[in-house]
Every structure is written in C-alpha cells, then in structure tokens.
A protein has these predicted regions:
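Short alpha-helical segments that sit at the start of domains
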Residues: 1-18
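Short capping segments at the starts of secondary-structure elements
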Residues: 22-28
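Non-DNA-binding regulatory cores of transcription-related proteins
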Residues: 60-82
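A short acidic, leucine-rich amphipathic alpha-helix
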Residues: 31-37
C-alpha cells in the first residue's frame, strides 16, 4: 500500500481498499466498515462510505447492485453475472 500513499491516498482509504482486495465476496458498506475497524479502530462509517465513493470514482474498486438489495463493492471491475 506504500505506492498508494505516494499518490495521496489516505490511510483510511488504503484500509478500505485493503478490505475489499482481501475479500472473496461482494461486501456492503456496513461489512467494509466492520472489517476496516479491525485495521483502523477509530475509522467512522462516514469515512468508509466516502472512501468507497472516492475509490469507485477513481476506478480502484467496482460497485455491484443486485436488484433492490444493498450496493456491494468488489475488487474486480470486469463484468460478471450471477
């Protein structure tokens, strides 16, 4: 994650990105928050949510929607249907 730091990615965003990269599943924002708190106990839900939006806008993560269910986040940006 050091190279991300040199690009101006905060430690909070690095933690959120790490959680998503380490997961084998599509995570909701709440799930990302739960995992990120293990890496950075003081991180807030708002910070996680804003980090997810930033990382998505920078094309570092993908956003997956399954109908009316909660939005989920994925490290894999290639299209895949379930």
């Amino acid at each position: 994650m050091n190279e991300l730091g040199s690009l101006g990615i905060t430690k909070q965003r690095q933690a959120v990105l790490q959680v998503i990269k380490d997961s084998e599943e599509h995570l909701t924002a709440n799930e990302v928050f739960d995992h990120a708190r293990r890496l950075l106990p003081g991180i807030s839900f708002a910070t996680v949510y804003n980090s997810l939006r930033y990382l998505k806008n920078e094309a570092l993560i993908g956003e997956v929607r399954f109908g009316m269910d909660a939005t989920r986040y994925d490290r894999n940006l290639t299209r895949h249907d379930h």
